[in-house]
Amino acid sequence: MSSPLAPVGIFDSGVGGLTVARAIIDQLPDEDIVYVGDTGNGPYGPLTIPEVRAHALAIGDDLVGRGVKALVIACNTASAACLRDARERYDVPVVEVILPAVRRAVATTRNGRIGVIGTRATITSHAYQDAFAAARDTEITAVACPRFVDFVERGVTSGRQVLGLAEGYLEPLQRSGVDTLVLGCTHYPLLSGLIQLVMGDNVTLVSSAEETAKEVLRVLTERDILRPHDAPPATRLFEATGDPEAFMALAARFLGPALTGVQPVRPSGMH
């Protein structure tokens, strides 16, 4: 069994998973975390599922090898690509971002019409559609929004260009009358103001980040490995497989004082 003092490992293809890290810091402020942003290989959306799986498992191997007590796949595309493999491969709990968001969306919808937006890889994997299959009386409309990630990774979350892009992407969801919209990519909460503007106030946005943090709390509590309140102050280590300075410039926008620095990392399984 893992030590309660061990850190929680979190990874994503880039900065998007920091929305999950931020939610975990807010909900579990005593926990040590190690975050890896795979900016050297991301974004994952345009890659094939085998490519995503290889990159994700290399990072998972590295984090588990460093003794994390839980592994959070803070990326919808990676969750769709390698969740089953990761749970078979590692002896620590693996938390993903898809099912927590699906549960919240089902509990939230009033008319049963739920939208999902994500990367092309996530949408074509049918991971969300399959996760919703058990929910009765729901109609799912899934739309790929591949260029959203590019804008977020460049730090562009408002303006005429991204607004026009959002209007085009979201039009099928407006047509289908969804009342609940799952932000099926951890980058997308950074565009939530824009998305809400386009969809209107009658549509509820569901962030996988908030729901995933709640799931981490549940898992650590069930396994009795929550870090005690009287432990030394929490440490948060942020690493990037690409340029750490570029990562830090973007990450600082939504982590603020929680971000004290970014280290370069190259997991041994990566090519």
Swiss-Prot record:
Q: Which residues form the signal peptide?
A: none
Q: Which reaction does it catalyse?
A: L-glutamate = D-glutamate
Q: Which SUPFAM superfamilies match?
A: Aspartate/glutamate racemase
UniProt keyword Ribosomal protein present: no
Protein name as it appears in the record: Glutamate racemase
Top-level taxonomy: Bacteria, Bacillati, Actinomycetota, Actinomycetes, Mycobacteriales
Keyword Isomerase in record: yes
As one GO molecular function, the record gives: glutamate racemase activity
The record ties this protein, via NCBIfam families, to: glut_race
Under which pathway is this protein filed? Cell wall biogenesis; peptidoglycan biosynthesis
Q: Classify the source by domain of life.
A: Bacteria
The EC number(s) attached to this protein equal 5.1.1.3
Q: Name one Pfam family in it.
A: Asp_Glu_race
Keyword annotations for this protein?
Cell shape, Cell wall biogenesis/degradation, Isomerase, Peptidoglycan synthesis
Query: Which biological process annotations from GO are given for this protein?
Result: cell wall organization; peptidoglycan biosynthetic process; regulation of cell shape
Q: What task does this protein carry out?
A: Provides the (R)-glutamate required for cell wall biosynthesis.
**Record-listed substrate binding positions:** D12, S13, Y44, G45, N76, T77, T186, H187
Q: Which InterPro entries match?
A: Asp/Glu/hydantoin_racemase, Asp/Glu_race, Asp/Glu_racemase_AS_1, Asp/Glu_racemase_AS_2, Glu_race
Q: Which family does it belong to?
A: Belongs to the aspartate/glutamate racemases family.
Q: Any idea which residues are catalytic in this one?
A: C75 (proton donor/acceptor), C185 (proton donor/acceptor)
